[in-house]
Amino acid sequence: MPPSKGLNGKLEKPKHALQAIVLSDSYNYRFRPLTLDKPRCLLPLANTPLIEYTFEFLALAGVQEVYVFCCAHAGQIREYIEKSKWNLPSSPFSVNTIVSRESLSVGDALRELDSKQLITSDFILVSGDVVSNVPLNEVLKEHRKRREDDKNAIMTMVVREASPFHRTRARTESSVFVIDKKTSQCVHYQANERGKHYVSMDPEIFNEHEELEVRNDLIDCQIDICSNDVPALFTENFDYQDIRKDFVYGVLTSDLLGKKIHCHVAKENYAARVRSLQTYDAISKDVLSRWVYPFVPDSNLLNQTFSYQRHQIYKEEDVVLARSCIIKARTLIGAYTKVGDASVVANTIIGRNCTIGSNCSIDSAFLWEDVVIGDNCRIGKAILANSVKIGNNCSIEDGAIVAAGVVIGDNTIIEKNKRLTTFESHSQGTLNDPSLVGIGGRGQEYHAEEDSDDEGEFMEASGLIESTNELHLSDSESSETSSSSEEDMEFIPFSARRDSANTINSEDFDEGDFNKEAQQSLERAFEENHQIDIAALELNTLRMAMNANYHEVRSAIVLALLRRIMHLDVSPKEALAKVMTRWGPLLAKLTFSHEEQVDNVLTLQKYCVRLSMTRHFLQLLGYFYQLEIAEENAIQEWYSDPRSSEGELAALRDAGGKQFVDWLNTAESESESEEGSE
């Protein structure tokens, strides 16, 4: 899809306008379930959307043209920008949006950017969750000077000096930078793996550089100044996905490219990235402590009315506080919020239009907008998203995440690290279970989807509360390289997907080299309307060339079919019929046994859950049956297979699966009855 017209109408761009690319998608799961219905870049940090801090940082740097690369929830991002001050004639830069439906990683985004030929000179590459007041003027001058002297100096990474255990450093970040002390050239980069306590370097590096610094004390916010060679290199190297682990490492270890990457180490100022709930908490506290000045609450970046009081207390106008309530240090309260009698609030950020009852204790919590808390409640270090309602006499323990719209009944305890959501397709357990959300409550426990790591490591990487046993540290970007868009959304009408995207965790779907090639082959087959035999021949040739098995082939086909269904700009019913009747026979052609038919249904079940297509599983199962991708006995065996009821798959088996099996049994009984009557 071509980029949208500059939202504030600035069609004439300077010859060498300073450009910036903002990656609005995080390509990981860490903020779920908060990001099931809202992109991370629009989550509130001290009552201000994250992307505002990124835009202010770019304005401070003198950027004149911004491209916001959108994937999931693209419509929300575009709407927000259209209504923001950045769309006014007074904006210091023009804003353009690029919507990609296929982007699975930073690498995919930069390849698409390269294909559009929008970058005319050096540009700044940042994520939409960066909070920084580092001035880039001198950094840009240094970068340009290096480029004049050496065209191979293609990139400058801006990193911040801090201790290895600084609180704004993600718990899983332990990247090592080896830097030439004289030239600031980065000669080696290593994203450490869990349990790895050494750095592997080419000995030749020591012969080529007189003095080297091996540094593990740098916070990498992924603020990069890039030449326009960088997107082209991603295009030339299609396996590059992550900007650090793939691109930087690949460039530095390549004898052929001959390119150079430098580091600028910021020793003053502030730079951090909200890459996990742990850093969300830390950076929020830093904003209240004024480390990010001038980007502080009383600067009122939006249409706000904050005033600053002693002990780092911030209040907007129209806040109603009971005489006997106590507001302690490092607290922010949004407009139209009410706090009841004898309640104590400390180290807490409260959004607009919240109501807090009497005799409550709230410490180190985050309350977003329209939150209601009853009387006699205790709220620990937790996040309560928009429109959450907490009954009387409740306790929300440390680490709990209560997503938008969840209702907690009276006399309920939400245990430590529990995550609740109203999205049934991303939850486990019984809907509105009184033992979980209380009598009259609404919501279910969120079930963390596993990507490249096990669930425990996922929770470690994204948890709100810290634990000393997590300080062994592992790779900072383990889930950023190739994960599903964290802002993965529920399955919405297909016509609404033209300007939004549903990204997929490449680890979840075993997207190794074979699957990537298979997806490209199938996409060509779809677009060029190949015959089934030709498409099957191409897949078989690819399978033999890459030593893959037929299970991988069939899995790739199922994934490609579902992607195709999602991206057609027609109704769900039409999309299902069009894709399955045309391309379902390809899957049937490459299925050779009863066991493989069972495997097909298991694969379909898994992908429907991961892609939030659970409501269409029943229809898809019907097509599998009609097209003999899975015959009746295979579907019956799938239903009895323990694998079909593992974890998050159980709900789908017990709903659509049971309904289809019941239909099969009824049809068989009727058939037997008719035969008996004859």
Curated annotation (Swiss-Prot):
Residues that bear Phosphothreonine: T172, T503
SUPFAM superfamilies: ARM repeat, Nucleotide-diphospho-sugar transferases, Trimeric LpxA-like enzymes
Location, primary (coarse class): cytoplasm
Entry-annotated residues carrying Phosphoserine: S500, S506
Subcellular location: Cytoplasm, Cytosol
Pfam family, one: W2
GO MF annotation terms: guanyl-nucleotide exchange factor activity; translation initiation factor activity; translation initiation factor binding
Keyword Cytoplasm applies: yes
Alphabetical GO biological process terms: cytoplasmic translational initiation
GO cellular component terms, semicolon-separated: cytosol; eukaryotic translation initiation factor 2B complex
Domain of life: Eukaryota
Residue span, W2 domain: 508-674
Assigned keywords, A-Z: Cytoplasm, Initiation factor, Phosphoprotein, Protein biosynthesis
UniProt-listed PROSITE patterns: W2 (PS51363)
Database matches in SMART domains: eIF5C
InterPro entries noted in UniProt: ARM-type_fold (IPR016024), eIF-2B_epsilon_N (IPR035543), eIF2B_epsilon (IPR051956), NTP_transferase_dom (IPR005835), Nucleotide-diphossugar_trans (IPR029044), Trimer_LpxA-like_sf (IPR011004), W2_domain (IPR003307), W2_eIF2B_epsilon (IPR044123)
Annotated segments matching region Disordered: 467-489
KW Phosphoprotein (keyword) present: yes
SUBUNIT field: Component of the translation initiation factor 2B (eIF2B) complex which is a heterodecamer of two sets of five different subunits: alpha, beta, gamma, delta and epsilon. Subunits alpha, beta and delta comprise a regulatory subcomplex and subunits epsilon and gamma comprise a catalytic subcomplex. Within the complex, the hexameric regulatory complex resides at the center, with the two heterodimeric catalytic subcomplexes bound on opposite sides.
Stated family: Belongs to the eIF-2B gamma/epsilon subunits family.
Function: Acts as a component of the translation initiation factor 2B (eIF2B) complex, which catalyzes the exchange of GDP for GTP on the eukaryotic initiation factor 2 (eIF2) complex gamma subunit. Its guanine nucleotide exchange factor activity is repressed when bound to eIF2 complex phosphorylated on the alpha subunit, thereby limiting the amount of methionyl-initiator methionine tRNA available to the ribosome and consequently global translation is repressed.
Protein's recorded name: Translation initiation factor eIF2B subunit epsilon
Organism: Schizosaccharomyces pombe (strain 972 / ATCC 24843)
